[in-house]
């Protein structure tokens, strides 16, 4: 368990993150450690969220299946909605009910990420839980580059407000 704590990043009071795998090409070797991590987190945490890429192996499928909430994240990229739809279908096939999935549109308000684009993403996902995270701009990029996620979420910016609201909504849904 000390290794689990050492591999984490505390981003806000009561909110801790793990991942990603340092060497993605070795992700399949992480299946058992991910299962062990999830076992510990289930005992020690109130809620476990799993956020993955669109590339799934056994470790990702097991993590998603064991999670309380699956965040399907997309943005204004051309293939984002299609990729998100595929991930939702895959998650459904490994046993995750759609009620445990949330469509998260990232960088809302950035250039090219307006209301129409966000709505197209949400319609493609066809999930009842929809979240929009406002664009954080260069200020967010600078804070994250120095590992200061807790400070970024604590600000009075549109980004910070949207993250706090999204977290509140997800916790209420659980």
Which sequence ranges carry the predicted segments?
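Phosphate-binding loop that captures ATP/GTP phosphates
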Residues: 1-17
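Phosphate-binding/switch loop-helix module in NTP-utilizing enzymes
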Residues: 18-60
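Inter-motif core of Ras-like GTPase G domains
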Residues: 43, 56-78
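Well-ordered beta-strand positions
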Residues: 47, 69, 129-131
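G-domain G4 guanine-recognition motif of GTPases
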Residues: 74-76, 90, 101-113, 132-138
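Conserved C-terminal guanine-recognition region of P-loop GTPase G domains, centered on the G4
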Residues: 84-100
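Beta-strand-loop-alpha "switch" segments that mediate conformational coupling across diverse proteins
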Residues: 107-108, 121-150
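C-terminal boundary of histidine-terminating zinc-finger modules
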Residues: 143-163
């Amino acid at each position: 368990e000390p290794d689990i704590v050492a591999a984490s990043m505390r981003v806000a009071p009561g909110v801790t993150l793990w991942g990603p795998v340092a060497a993605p090409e070795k992700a399949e070797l992480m299946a058992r450690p991910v299962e062990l991590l999830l076992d510990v987190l289930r005992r020690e945490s109130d809620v476990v969220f799993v956020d993955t890429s669109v590339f799934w192996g056994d470790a990702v499928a097991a993590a998603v299946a064991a999670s309380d909430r699956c965040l399907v994240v997309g943005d204004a990229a051309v293939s984002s909605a299609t990729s998100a739809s595929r991930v939702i279908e895959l998650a459904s096939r490994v046993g995750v009910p759609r009620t445990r999935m949330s469509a998260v549109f990232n960088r809302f308000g950035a250039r090219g990420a307006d209301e129409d684009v966000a709505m197209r993403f949400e319609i493609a996902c066809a999930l009842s839980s929809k979240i929009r995270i406002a664009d954080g701009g260069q200020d967010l990029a600078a804070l994250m580059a120095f590992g200061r996620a807790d400070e970024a979420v604590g600000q009075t910016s549109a980004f910070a407000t949207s993250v706090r609201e999204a977290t509140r909504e997800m916790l209420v849904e659980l």
